[in-house]
Design a protein with these regions (language model features):
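Residues that line or immediately flank small-molecule/substrate-binding pockets and catalytic motifs
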Residues: 62, 96, 120
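A short, polar/charged loop-to-alpha-helix boundary motif
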Residues: 62-74, 79
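Zinc-dependent deaminase
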Residues: 1-35, 107-174
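Short beta-strand scaffold segments in enzyme catalytic cores
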Residues: 43-52
Length: 174
């Protein structure tokens, strides 16, 4: 074993989900597959009200729109936020196929969404992305953003890691 391997922190452990959370996270993962099929990065998001009403769904549309902010989470929030009040969103859950980036975590904070469930974590995503500078992220956890929030944002993940990882295989430049 190399010295580097012994200094790396362990990958986050998978979190078990109940039937409802699993169903909606799988819906977000299916949207990630659609995003990839359309030439985008493979990410999907679903926002669900406390009563189970679907408020919004979206996939990453960077590739097809050229909009660097067209991440799945921000796109879903752009649909849900004007149509539903802050109280509804505070009780809602955003399901994301991947751990939200710092931009998306900020949008989740500003939208008042109170709960996030995500699939593949940022550490595992970085392994798919490789070392190319044009594919790097800010390396700031969404939990860091959520922990700085004056209102609570529950964060559950990583979950369904193998399912959430599948659409990333071969999707990133070597």
């Amino acid at each position: 074993m190399s010295a580097l391997a012994t200094t790396l922190p362990p990958l986050p452990a998978e979190v078990p989900l109940d039937e409802r959370d699993g169903r909606y996270l799988r819906q977000a993962i299916a949207l990630a597959d659609q995003a990839r099929a359309r030439g985008n990065r493979p990410f999907g998001a679903v926002i669900v009200a406390a009563d189970g009403t679907l408020l919004a769904e979206a996939w990453n549309a960077n590739g097809e729109t050229g909009d660097c902010t067209a991440h799945a989470e921000t796109s879903a929030i752009r649909v849900a936020s004007p149509a539903h009040g802050r109280d509804t969103l505070a009780a809602a859950t955003l399901y994301s196929s991947g751990e939200p980036c710092v931009m998306c975590a900020g949008a989740i904070f500003w939208s008042n969404i109170g709960r996030v469930v995500y699939g593949i974590d940022a550490e595992r995503l970085r392994a798919f992305r490789g070392e190319r500078q044009d594919q790097r992220d800010a390396e700031l956890s969404c939990r860091d953003v959520f922990n700085a929030s004056p209102h609570p944002i529950a964060c559950i993940g990583p979950a369904l890691i193998d399912e959430a990882s599948a659409s990333h295989v071969g999707a990133w430049k070597a």
